Design a protein with these regions (language model features):
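Transmembrane helix-loop-helix hairpins at the membrane interface
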Residues: 145-254
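Hydrophobic core of alpha-helical transmembrane segments in multi-pass integral membrane proteins
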Residues: 32-37, 75-89, 115-119, 196-197
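Alpha-helical transmembrane segments and their helix-start/interface "positive-inside/aromatic belt" motifs
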Residues: 13-31, 98-112
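Alpha-helical transmembrane segments of multi-pass membrane proteins
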Residues: 29-51, 121-122, 126
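N-terminal juxtamembrane cytosolic/stromal segments of multi-pass membrane proteins
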Residues: 1-25, 50-54
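Perimembrane loop-to-helix junctions flanking transmembrane segments
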Residues: 49-66, 136-140
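Interfacial helix-start motif at the membrane-water boundary
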Residues: 59-80
């Protein structure tokens, strides 16, 4: 459905409606992807070990299966190209151009949401398991701060792409087609199962955390929150919020 946005740049309706559109949401995600890919290449040069975000590794493995040996190398570029193509297509259909000021506001919104999410998810987790999640989450194999930053940025792009765009959407289709659930029931099923898988994913691999109940509940609730944010605010805001959320959380853990 097409809507006519108010012409005033400061309009609240204009901001919420415009920034959820692909031309803003996907364009906003591109710098995050480029920052992650640049850091990943720089940090992995000459190390002999390729450290990347786990969701990125999983998606690149899938790309290798589909595209052969060049799949992992081409994958990041293909994701960036897809984001840009969809954003440009939406921009051409819109009546006006992009307003740079809105991207600044989107970054501020993402940072505020990251702080709020950390607090709210922590409080809810503490109520459910009677524990302080930031104190009980186990320490995985330690990483230097540049690596922490790189992995966190990758979480924003690739974990949202994998767990929200692909997994939750796939579960929603399966719940309707296979289980015969209605829209509301299928949505609850997809978001809940997706959040559980999202949480479990963080305990896999050499850099995964030791499994314990408080951290598992903490990440499950975070997965539910990010799914809700994705539905209401789109991919770009959710990706940046997730990335900054991870940076703040890992910084708090030292």
């Amino acid at each position: 459905m097409t809507s006519v946005l108010p012409t005033s740049p400061g309009s609240r309706q204009s901001y919420w409606a415009a920034t959820r559109s692909p031309r803003y949401s996907l364009t906003f995600a591109v710098p995050l992807l480029l920052l992650y890919e640049t850091l990943a290449v720089a940090l992995n040069q000459g190390t002999g070990v390729g450290i990347r975000n786990g969701a990125d590794v999983l998606l690149r493995s899938l790309a290798a299966t589909l595209l052969g040996d060049r799949g992992p190398v081409l994958f990041g570029g293909l994701v960036a190209l897809l984001l840009i193509v969809v954003a440009v297509r939406d921009l051409r259909r819109s009546s006006g151009g992009l307003r740079p000021r809105l991207f600044v506001l989107m970054l501020v919104e993402s940072a505020l949401l990251a702080v709020v999410f950390g607090f709210v998810v922590g409080v809810v987790t503490a109520q459910l398991v009677n524990a302080l999640p930031l104190l009980t989450i186990g320490q995985a194999q330690p990483m230097e701060w540049p690596v922490v930053l790189m992995v966190s940025l990758g979480a924003g792009v690739y974990e949202e792409l994998l767990f929200r765009v692909l997994l939750v959407s796939g579960l929603l289709l399966a719940a309707r087609a296979i289980l015969g659930l209605g829209t509301v029931a299928a949505s609850i099923f997809a978001v809940t199962i997706g959040a559980l898988i999202f949480s479990a994913f963080h305990y896999i691999g050499p850099y995964g955390d030791p499994l314990d109940l408080p951290s598992f509940v903490f990440r499950t609730i975070a997965g539910l929150a990010f799914s809700g944010l994705y539905v209401t605010r789109g991919f770009g805001i959710t990706a940046w919020t997730h990335a900054l959320y991870d940076v703040f959380l890992l910084a708090a853990r030292g």
